[in-house]
């Protein structure tokens, strides 16, 4: 499923632009934005070894806490079915734009496109900062050194422990708003996509935070004896 995450929305949104024969400026913009999003994510996933058999470090931990049959059910219904369905849902603003091609691309669309690109740039910077830090730490350990910091706390990570997640979610809200602009309504049924995506990232972040707090007592600024007794602070999400 991880391998499909950066590809499926590109296909879905691109198909709506193709169905309009690439004559609709709004759909073309949406397709290009999602293509740029997919290219960034694919590159980042590939350099981490995602296409070479490397596994997200969280999956073994999750499997260890379940019986085999429980994980198989989780894999089928949540990872495969639900997440594939979610990728369809977050792409549906393009369907709204497709159904309302009569409305012209306007200043609001341009503002949202620029906002999406700003968020994409932010996520790219956050990913690169994390990559540079992790690679530097690996080289230092391989040379027999001891890293001064065990996790990143500068750059964008000075303001949030997960700036890449923050920017990622906001991009799909921006795409949703572009769809809204095509119909002239701020609220529509396709809001379910970014809402469910936000909830998915909140759940994923909480799980990641628990693992990090267990591994690094100083993570989050909590003393070791308090781990497990405090809720996650807002810095996990604050931009």
Report the location of each language-model feature.
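Juxtamembrane helix-capping/reentrant segments at transmembrane boundaries
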Residues: 1-11, 54-78, 146-157
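Hydrophobic transmembrane alpha-helices
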Residues: 8-42, 84-129, 134, 138, ...
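A basic- and aromatic-enriched beta-loop-alpha substructure that forms the phosphate/nucleotide-
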Residues: 25-68
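A general boundary/transition motif marking the beginning of the first structured unit of a protein
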Residues: 47-51, 77, 200
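Hydrophobic alpha-helical transmembrane segments
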Residues: 73-83, 237-238
